[in-house]
Regions:
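A short alpha-helical cap/connector motif
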Residues: 1-146, 156-199
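Structural detector of well-ordered beta-strand residues that form the stable sheet scaffold
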Residues: 149-151
């Protein structure tokens, strides 16, 4: 019974994204910050970023993983983050990749605590195994007044990721639903908004 509901929910979201693809090009986005984020960081229209291709080859990243790693790299650079925390099965690889891109950033992988100054959190596939239950609440509820970006993967595949996504969406200033990933931005200076993109 739940499997059928989950499949129908997934298909409904795919159709919704196909209909609302306009945000991918920046159409209908009225916030200048979000317009620039979508075009210059998420899409990289100007091809202004370089990537550590030696690490991509060494780690044997497939096309989808390479897109994910590059997206995270562009986000951390565009948002000028100082502290990154990653949870998930592939978190060590992502941590190494981001460290190569941002040598000055403090990067923590599958840690048991959340540094108070963290401004970028990545919850990857299988983050449930590494994320203590008390930290799950702290990630969303401590973000209140702080400038923070949270990226959650598999928001329509994993029950726990979907629950976190829905809870975070209610509290976040801006949420970007990218079908495979959800990006939550907490920043009181930003204009509130919800966007649907597929890259």
């Amino acid at each position: 019974m739940f499997g059928c509901f989950f499949i129908m929910s997934y298909l409904k979201e795919r159709i919704k994204h196909a209909v609302r693809f306009r945000h991918k090009r920046g159409y209908g986005v009225h916030s200048p910050f979000m317009f620039n984020l979508i075009l210059n960081a998420i899409r990289d229209k100007e091809k202004q970023y370089t990537y550590p291709e030696n690490i991509e080859k060494r780690d044997g990243l497939g096309h989808r993983k390479k897109k994910e790693f590059r997206l995270l790299s562009r986000l951390t650079r565009y948002l000028k983050v100082n502290s990154v925390t990653c949870f998930g099965v592939g978190a060590p690889r992502i941590g190494n990749y981001l460290k190569a891109m941002e040598p000055g950033a403090d990067i923590q992988v599958n840690g048991g605590t959340l540094p108070p100054e963290v401004d970028f959190i990545y919850l990857g596939r299988g983050f449930q195994q590494y994320l203590p239950a008390d930290l799950e609440r702290e990630i969303l509820f401590a973000a209140g007044g702080k400038r923070r970006c949270i990226v959650i993967t598999d928001i329509y595949k994993s029950r726990q990721a979907g629950r976190l996504w829905r809870q975070g969406r209610e509290r976040a200033t801006v949420c970007l639903d990218m079908m495979w990933y959800g990006i939550l931005l907490f920043d009181e200076k930003l204009q509130k908004g919800r966007y649907n993109l597929i890259i």
